[in-house]
Amino acid sequence: MSKVSGSNGGDSKNTLYCSFCGKSQHEVRKLIAGPTVFICDECVELCMDIIREENKTSMVKSRDGVPTPQEIIKVLDEYVIGQQQAKRILSVAVHNHYKRLAHAAKSSDVELAKSNIMLVGPTGCGKTYLAQTLARIIDVPFTMADATTLTEAGYVGEDVENIILKLLQAADYNVERAQRGIVYIDEVDKISRKSDNPSITRDVSGEGVQQALLKIMEGTVASVPPQGGRKHPQQEFLQVDTTNILFICGGAFAGLDKIISARGEKTSIGFGATVRAPEDRRVGEVLRELEPEDLVKFGLIPEFIGRLPVLATLEDLDEDALIQILSEPKNALVKQYQRLFEMEDVELNFHEDALREIARRAIVRKTGARGLRSIMEKILLDTMFELPTLEGVREVVISDEVVKGTARPLYIYSERSEEKTNVSA
């Protein structure tokens, strides 16, 4: 196959066109010639996107027709940087969950219990994003709930049954599909018990919510009002069995590392006591030693922890990981902004030092990967404001000085606009 480069000149009689989209060689970067047809670089890219999507949906299945853990983790790797242990735990847990459902469909005297998952990690390390990515690659209904909005039944706020309603809506009110879905409950650390004394006052948004979640996580038939909201006696309810719904809970658990560290220290007093240096390990390293008893001390009730037998801890992201997150995944932030600039026919490029400075600033803010977008927005705000009204800008280059605020982005103009400027001068 031969390549034909796009150019601005040329005889119209000899102009070649893409056989798929009909664009001429002057409208595209490359035109690839076959024996009797031509295809442009844009159509090649579109075809590759279609193939990638099909590969994602037609994952390799195990004997039970369930996606294999290797296949699940392979797709997770395309979107989520690092967190290999957490990805491994998640992929095995999801694989086993759907194997269990396939097993339950057959008559057997051995009943396989459900293994719900708890994700623990610092803010911005990828807990929510892992769950969202899982939802995209597994063909089951999925919903996310915020634990901070939940209250006990009868109080102002959302009932726990509303979570099942959201799952039912995600399944287009197909009860059978909803009963095989996945529910992710975020910010679960915010419903920890407010006091070590369980009888102090009624804790309707803390321990009360944990108690309310117990039955739906273990398995019960929930009565769900089809149009949402509070229940009315005249309403007809949909009955949803939650036995086969996989629950994943996630939270940052700020301060949990101190509880774990305190458990590991055997303090002594007197002249023979060992003088310990202050804890200099990263939060993610400390969380690896997490035990269920630490979560009880944090404020979760033992019954709630017992419904979440699979514990996965996530690492806090270092500078190198944040740089990878900025540039490597399929929907990396740099790629997103480059696509935005492409819509203005402008190429956006970042120096390696600029990405490193952005990562450093995110670490200082202690917001993890979540803080990267706000830093990028601040850096590119003036450029995005000016660009639509500027003529002839071909490329914008961001250096570390731009990130630090000591310089402006470098604008590179096309030769044509420079010629026009010289003529007008």
UniProtKB/Swiss-Prot annotation:
One GO cellular component term of this record is: HslUV protease complex
Q: One biological process GO term for this chain?
A: proteolysis involved in protein catabolic process
Stretches assigned to the ClpX-type ZB domain: 6-59
Which PROSITE patterns does the entry mention? CLPX_ZB (PS51902)
Cite the GO molecular-function annotations of the record: ATP binding; ATP hydrolysis activity; ATP-dependent protein folding chaperone; protein dimerization activity; unfolded protein binding; zinc ion binding
Q: Does the keyword Phosphoprotein apply?
A: no
Please give the Gene3D superfamilies that the UniProt record associates with this protein: 1.10.8.60, ClpX chaperone, C4-type zinc finger domain, P-loop containing nucleotide triphosphate hydrolases
So what family is this one in? Belongs to the ClpX chaperone family.
Tagged with keyword Metal-binding: yes
What the entry lists under CDD domains is as follows: RecA-like_ClpX
Q: Which InterPro entries match?
A: AAA+_ATPase, ATP-dep_Clp_protease_ClpX, ATPase_AAA_core, Clp_ATPase_C, Clp_protease_ATP-bd_su_ClpX, ClpX_bact, P-loop_NTPase, Znf_CppX_C4
- Describe the task this protein carries out: ATP-dependent specificity component of the Clp protease. It directs the protease to specific substrates. Can perform chaperone functions in the absence of ClpP.
Residues annotated as binding Zn(2+) are 18, 21, 40, 43
Source organism: Rhizobium meliloti (strain 1021)
Subunit structure, briefly?
Answer: Component of the ClpX-ClpP complex. Forms a hexameric ring that, in the presence of ATP, binds to fourteen ClpP subunits assembled into a disk-like structure with a central cavity, resembling the structure of eukaryotic proteasomes.
Protein name according to UniProt: ATP-dependent Clp protease ATP-binding subunit ClpX
Provide the alphabetized UniProt keywords: ATP-binding, Chaperone, Metal-binding, Nucleotide-binding, Zinc
Source species, domain of life: Bacteria
Question: What are the binding positions for ATP in this chain?
Answer: 122-129
